[in-house]
């Protein structure tokens, strides 16, 4: 009995240098999610004996919440519980609206979905865009009612869509912090 705590240094983070960061940015953003999925697959591989694949719990906040939301939708079979905190999960719609604060500045990180290449890249990993009929893990999500950067309705839209398409009885919960943001 016990637990294992793992930190995955996936591409897009700068811990392993500038090139590692660039390998997870813009048209390479999908690498971030693929790296995380590979880590989860490795941990849950029965031959490694690290953990029961049905008991993997993952957590991330803000842009890390995007990571958690994306891998939840891409490979829901890998996780028992996912905890996206104030997650940026409707990348396509948010990045399409240049009137939202910081959007145009963030195009250098995520891409501009108003251009074909940016659209194609974001389409590949945007959690909200990619929900389909599937079995989804239990989810505990948080958002700040007054958060100007990651509005609470992004996670509410995602959870509503997952509930519409899910083929299981797992629970998706949202906690809205009314004093946060």
Positions of PLM-derived features:
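Active-site-proximal cap/loop segments of hydrolase catalytic domains
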Residues: 1, 7-181
């Amino acid at each position: 009995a016990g637990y294992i705590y793992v930190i995955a240094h996936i591409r897009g983070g700068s811990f392993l240098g500038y090139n590692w960061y660039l390998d997870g940015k813009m048209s390479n953003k999908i690498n971030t999610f693929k790296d995380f999925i590979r880590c989860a697959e490795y941990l849950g591989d029965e031959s490694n004996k690290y953990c029961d694949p049905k008991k993997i719990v993952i957590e991330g906040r803000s842009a890390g919440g995007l990571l958690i939301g994306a891998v939840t939708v891409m490979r829901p079979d890998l996780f028992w519980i996912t905890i996206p905190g104030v997650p940026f999960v409707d990348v396509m719609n948010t990045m399409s609206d240049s009137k939202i604060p910081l959007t145009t500045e963030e195009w250098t990180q995520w891409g501009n979905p108003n251009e074909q290449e940016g659209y194609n890249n974001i389409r590949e990993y945007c959690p909200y865009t990619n929900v389909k009929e599937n079995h989804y893990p239990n989810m505990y999500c948080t958002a700040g009612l007054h958060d100007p950067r990651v509005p609470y309705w992004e996670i509410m839209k995602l959870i509503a869509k997952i509930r519409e398409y899910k083929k299981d009885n797992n629970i998706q919960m949202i906690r809205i912090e009314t004093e946060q943001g």
